[in-house]
Amino acid sequence: MFLTSTKSIFEFRTRGGGCVKALHPFAKFGGKFRSFLDVHISKCRQTVKECRKEDDEDDTNSIRCVDGAGSRIHPLLHVVTTSHMTHRPIENYLNRHHNGLMSSTPNNKTCTDIRLSRGRSIGLRMIPTVHDLKFAWEERQQQRLDPQAQKVKDCANGALMDWAEQTGEGSDYADDRRPLQCLHPVGHYYEIPNLMLNGTLRDLLQERPQLEYLMLHNIDTVGANVDARILGTVIQHDSATLTFEVIPREIDDVGGGLGRVNNTVRMIEGLALPREDDEFVFSYYNSMTTWIHIDRLLAKYALTRNDLDDAKMVAASLQAFSHRLPTYVALKDVKKRWGRGHEDVFPTAQFEKLWSDMSTLEEMDCHYLVVPRVRGAQLKDPSQLDGWLRDGSKGYVESICDF
């Protein structure tokens, strides 16, 4: 099963355009600009076609895209995760451009069975503490401006510290003018728990009880697909609960990597590092693409497939498990608009739990697989598109798609 995480909004540096990242037409394929979601759907279509072709050529040594009854017309499961801000736009986009949420029928031209997994986890932004602001502005590395500009910046920072102290450090951030910006997604760790909380995983396992593996990836990892060779490698190392894909690190790769802590190899998030320049010691970057063995992961949550019918038990198990993972506090700017072109920008604090921290748990059996950059590199900013086009990454993505 192909699991695409699309919780992001206001990303790919849309300069405040409010675009859902998954729906951003970032590059031209087949003579037409395609969105991130279009690319991932077309990759699923190509994967199923290749499996069918191999199945026809070699009936004994191929990977079959079949159901329990042996039918060869059975689309690849493609689950798209959403948040409270992205669910409706993505649902409307699929209805307009991909004939809705395609089901498993003989006339399914997309060769994929697309489902939406609606996010059930949400957070409320808070007023940061003065200590948080001082750490962000005074203790972390910052560019020094010319004397006059630096005075203006220091004055503005001082005013924001006074605002945080007067409003109430650590209190809830509330803005009646734009209530949605008071809420925030709580990190991509919750994408898998959301599958259980909203019943998506339960329904999929009931429809296809032979399902054993999930492949989780970010929407901006455009080269990730269900590669039969990688899947075979994952199955061969059958003891792993999670298999993370990593890529050779380059200077622009920020956000964490593969490291060794207390003689244990694990993923280290950038937010967990004491200094920003510590990230430069990593040789491998975390692509966030993860192969998940379903039953073993459920066992780590103290659950089984049959337990997924009990919503209260699932919620309690997930809540207890989440307490074992670190929680990060990040500062995010929000705009308070007063009208007539006047607005103020305030820093707010939000908390996040990150999926890669699953590797920090001692009982979590994790393996790590080095893959080429064309498969694991992420597109975070439009400035990356030129290099992405020139180094052959775009050509590789086009070769694994069927538009």
Predicted regions and their residues:
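Domain-scale recognition of functional cores that engage charged ligands
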Residues: 1, 10-356
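Residue-level signal for short, function-critical loop segments
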Residues: 6, 84, 372
